[in-house]
Amino acid sequence: MTEILTSDDMRSLERAAIASGRASGLELMERAGAAVVEAIAEAWPDIRPPAVALRHAMILCGPGNNGGDGFVVARLLRRRGWKVTLYLYGEADRLPPDARANHDRWRRIGTIAPLPAAPDFSSADLVVDALFGLGLTRPLTGFGPIFAALASAGRPVLAIDLPSGRDADARADAAGWPSAPCSLAVTFHREKPAHAQLRAEGIGVIVKPIGL
């Protein structure tokens, strides 16, 4: 039987890896971003440069380490020839240290715009949802127009860990929380309780190792 980890379990594993010196937080973030880019190439080979003309990824980065993963994805996709548009929800000065480091690395090669209230996703070949991951403990407010715009655009959406708005631990009281549309979720090391719900809804789930 496949092992399922709660969000607390996953954070404990990451902290243990960092404390033991087996990996730094930055290294884990880099591995996660690289795993997402690998999953993109596997899931959508038809939109992978250079086999086709320049492709456009829109990446939505949030205020935590999920957003940090998104900055890594942006940098690595650009290196592979993608056009990248990156939006940040929140203030750069309030990002956790590892996420801020990857924000700064991206800023040296690309631009960052504040996340609009209702973005236009019509030009995107792929949207990466790196807004909120495993740490969400409350329903999101104010994201309805963003999620609606994403749904109406009909573009492929890859979520890092989980679609933003989902509770990783699938608690009963979180069943009605609003969440982003999603085509594929890429999570790391092991599935979390919410991934069974995604599969039941016909959403793809890929688990990638990051050396934990």
UniProtKB/Swiss-Prot annotation:
Q: Could you tell me the EC number(s) of this protein?
A: 5.1.99.6
Q: Which reaction does it catalyse?
A: (6R)-NADHX = (6S)-NADHX; (6R)-NADPHX = (6S)-NADPHX
Q: Which domain of life is it from?
A: Bacteria
Q: Give the protein's function.
A: Catalyzes the epimerization of the S- and R-forms of NAD(P)HX, a damaged form of NAD(P)H that is a result of enzymatic or heat-dependent hydration. This is a prerequisite for the S-specific NAD(P)H-hydrate dehydratase to allow the repair of both epimers of NAD(P)HX.
Under the heading Pfam families, the entry gives: YjeF_N (PF03853)
Under which main EC class is this enzyme filed?
A: isomerase
Question: What residues bind (6S)-NADPHX, as annotated?
Answer: 65-69, 133-139, 161
User: What family does this chain come from, according to its entry?
Assistant: Belongs to the NnrE/AIBP family.
What cofactor requirement does the entry state? K(+)
Q: Which residues does the annotation say bind K(+)?
A: 66, 129, 164
Say if the entry is tagged with keyword Cell wall biogenesis/degradation: no
GO terms, molecular function: metal ion binding; NAD(P)HX epimerase activity; nucleotide binding
Name of the protein this chain belongs to: NAD(P)H-hydrate epimerase
Give residue ranges for domain YjeF N-terminal: 10-212
| Keyword annotations | Isomerase, Metal-binding, NAD, NADP, Nucleotide-binding, Potassium
InterPro entries linked: YjeF_N_dom, YjeF_N_dom_sf
Q: How is the cofactor bound?
A: Binds 1 potassium ion per subunit.
